[in-house]
Amino acid sequence: MKIMEDQINPINIRKQKDLDDNLEEITSENSEIAPADIEKKMLENHAYPSPTQEDFQRAIYVKRDFYIHSIPERKVLNTYDEIKEFRDNKCAGNFKLTESQTLLSNFINPNTPYRGLLMFWGTGVGKSCGAIAIAEKFKHMVEKYGTKIHVLVPGPINKQNFLNEIIKCTGETYTKMFQDKTIVINEAEKNRIRKNALNVVNQYYRIMSYRSFYKKVLGEKIRDKVVTGNKVKLTSRKTETGEFERDISIDRIYSLDNTLLIVDEAHNITGNGEGDAVKKIIDVSKNLKVVFLSATPMKNLADSIVELINYLRPKNYQMERDKIFTSQRGSEMDFKPGGRDYLRKMVRGYVSYLRGADPLTFAERVDIGEIPPGLDFTKVTRCFMLPFQLGVYDNVIATQDDSLDRNSEAVANFVFPGLSKDRNSKNIEGYYGIKGMNEIRNQILNNSETLNRRIASTILSEYEIEDPSNLMYLTDNNSVISGNIFNEKYLKHFSIKFYSALQKINETVYGKRNSGLIFIYLNLVRVGISIFQEVLLMNGYLEYQENTNNYNLKRDTRCYFCDHKYGDHYNLPDDIPKHDFYPATFITVTGKSEEDIEQIPEEKHRILNNVFNNVNNREGKYLKIVIGSRVMNEGITLRNIKEIYILDVHFNLGKVDQAIGRGIRFCTHYGITNEKDPFPKVEVNKYVVSVKNGLSTEEQLYKKAESKYKLIKQVERILQEEAIDCPLNRNGNIFPEEMKRYANCGTKDNPCPAICGYMPCEFKCGDKLLNAKYYDPDRAVYKKITKSELDYSTYNNALASDEIDYSKAKIKEMYKLDFIYTLKDILRYVKKSYPVEKREMFDDFYVYQALNDLIPITGNDFNNFHDTIADKYNRPGYLIYINTYYIFQPFDENENIPMYYRRIFTPPTINKINVKDYIKNTPEYRQHKNLYQLDEEGPIDREYDFDSVQDYYDSRDEFDYVGIIDRESSKRKNGTNSSGDEFKIRRKRPKILSKKRETGIPSFLGAVCSTSKDKKYLASIMKKLNLDENKSDSRMDICDRIKNKLFDLEKYSTNNMTYLIIPSNHPHIPFPLNLKDRVQYIIDQIKRETRSSINPEIKTIKTTGEFNDIDYIYYELYYDSSMDKYQDILTLYGAKKINNDWIIIIK
């Protein structure tokens, strides 16, 4: 690859000799510098400003390093076409880092003196990408020192999310080396590219949960059980010196030298052991830089900001809480005199702020309701309780401490009617909370008839109920209280709040309030979410099922779109648009424990992303309602939300705002905006129970929360005003539409919006010198700076990389259109495409350097060449320079071919796509595939689900050897097993959980029988199973016989012992396999679906089978004619009507 010497562009010969040379010196190749200028440059201060400077913000503002990345001013857009174009660029354009994200990568990197930063950015504005932009600047540190960039996240789901963000936020950095743009890439190839990219990412990043980091730094405390009387207490073991004994991890982290530590949702590490671990590593590590991410840096109290900022400040110059806040705690806390000024001084240089929430890319939040007397800004829907609930409420003493009062909250949510504990009393008493629910369960089990009859004759006497037997009963193996008391007709007597919310939810249909997606948030699970789920089930809503055939549609099942139910949906009025019936469904999202962190189960996370957030589901066709707990506060995005319901009170309004932020995020409503509805709104409904005189406990709790929230917002305003990028990000924090709308907000008639913390949206930065010189009070913006005023003292080639990359991208754009350009052409195109407001700062050097990188000359250049260019035919190549022309050169052509052959290209068809991939992407293949892929079986390669059956098998004792039916590994598939199953086996596992973690304990799924066990081992199992050994049997034969015996033992045994484990979603073997358990399972399912408590008569019938030592039986279930009305449900379970009975045979 050699060309004539006189054809080589001089730019290519001139490589970068000194990265710290001034750009103006570099761009002028033959410039002469006078001795006086040399002396002046030698005396220049090439240092960054210190956070201790009072004019720190001004010094940052005028630096070329940062000013180039200021957010440009946006004018008011008046026409829909202008708004649509703006949104298309922001929401649907190709991904690129925002100016704010790039700015931070120039502020925190290995070459700047700044140690750490709190990224106080709003929800959904790109915190993760900002942190990743910083991290990418540390990759050469990873290569140099053999360390890794460490990222701490709350839990496993967040870990996967952050990995996804790395791939998204870095463009083609990790993927371009694995993809060939000249061929069709199918889904399998995309997955392969992604997998390879993640492998590269993992060479630079180490992502772990807070808890894992804590274990690797400090170690878990060793706890002992101490039994005193009937109580068991856990105590932490201590050494002789009084320190806690700890279980130290093998791969312990002692320090993180020469790298970067990122902590996502950093407010979670204050006041706990995880924070202690972070502090220890920061204190002992050398040259460690730290980035904290948080939309709500204060969890509950304003003074938690002190601990968070102190992680970033020098160890010997920490912020003191008592100089800022008064000694009171909770809602009584306030600023001390001089506290604000001291706080400003101590946070200066350590905070970046970006509000985001541009009204053109964020839906508008509309708070519904009224502000009760005594509250300042919280709008709520007040629900006045009826006599029964109010009587119980009056007997509950309101708590006065600063915590969530679970008793009063439980009463506010739901009061269950029950028999009096005084046997002589015939009154109905109210029960609430978990204890109350347990009491009601016992009463239903022991005295259901009396209880229901008494409820009908007292509380519900006005309804004249003829058959009260279904008012309350138990379902799901007697664990769930259900019944008609949850029906809308009676619900208001037991929960006025849930009744009011249900009425409004029912109206979210066409012709009333229009159909749309709903998010319901409750902090309490067992006395909140579980009860409201039952309310929905009893009022025509169904729990979401991935297989639509599993829905049990009844006459009163609600339609997702209109107000007509399933029974009369066939006869819709003409004024309702034609639509197919799909049931209105919901899904509950509560946490599962993962290293003491509440995490969303992966399966539900997938459903939220793929089903609920799908634009085709924008009206709730497939999934209408999400009910979530506090696990939904962070890391989840809900798209196209129409309404949000907050059904219980949290003592921390910041947490409530985080929950609301799940549905109001950057571009989440982009897919449903149109000219008729250009500005989508999200209604936020906060429900509280109320009393006629004074405030209820829920309203009082909101009042306390307001006091804390106001102080937190005052602290946040100080952080906003002192942020390093305050003047640079001003146009991303204050928007022209809001300036006009909320110009004089703060009165009762015109309150300031929640997005601005119920304070005026406009604010000035804290630097007085900056404001005096650059603030324009008439336009409420900071003035532009001319190029001559900019400080170039610390600007170098490394910081110019973003502009160079921009130039490369534009040059690559050009070669998609033509094959040959002059330098003049390229300079003109790149400059013209540069943003107008920054064009003055554009330097020709960026284009020179970009061209230099795109033209490999030496063999070493080719070996390290990554800036591949593609022409209009997607051929990969590079640039060559010949006689003042820059010419596209394909990799597979000689450099001396005439231009005619460069312009003419016949794409070869050989080996561009293999036959297998071609066939798999044809409609014929997909149609053929679907014929053999039943809907209820799901995707052919779907993994078996053992997680959901773990509790079932853990509750049973195990036989000495346990078999497992698992999906065959892809590495072992040979086409001989049509079912795709393989039989595994293992020894019995210990019953106690702690013993299961010891060395040598077999895994839950065991090992493949036919390949991992020798014949001697298998023979001992056969002996244990009373099977005769055949010497001619192969290992495969022996395994088949063992499997058959364990299969029948599992199926027919009645001793509650596990012999064979099967997944819940096996396409052919039902779960549970054990017939005795399956009988109870079917009975419970029928109870749940019919909402009845009727038990069938069960007959056990003996039969014969393969093994003489097994008692073979089957069961018959007999339901009488009272179940005729549930004919459709019974037939689904195989029931047949014989004489007057419905009979289900289970065998």
Curated annotation (Swiss-Prot):
Domain of life where this protein originates: Viruses
Location (main, coarse): virion
EC class name: hydrolase
Keywords: ATP-binding, Helicase, Hydrolase, Nucleotide-binding, Virion
Keyword Hydrolase: yes
GO molecular function ontology, one term from the record: ATP hydrolysis activity
Name of the protein described by the UniProt record: Putative ATP-dependent RNA helicase L377
Taxon lineage: Viruses, Varidnaviria, Bamfordvirae, Nucleocytoviricota, Megaviricetes
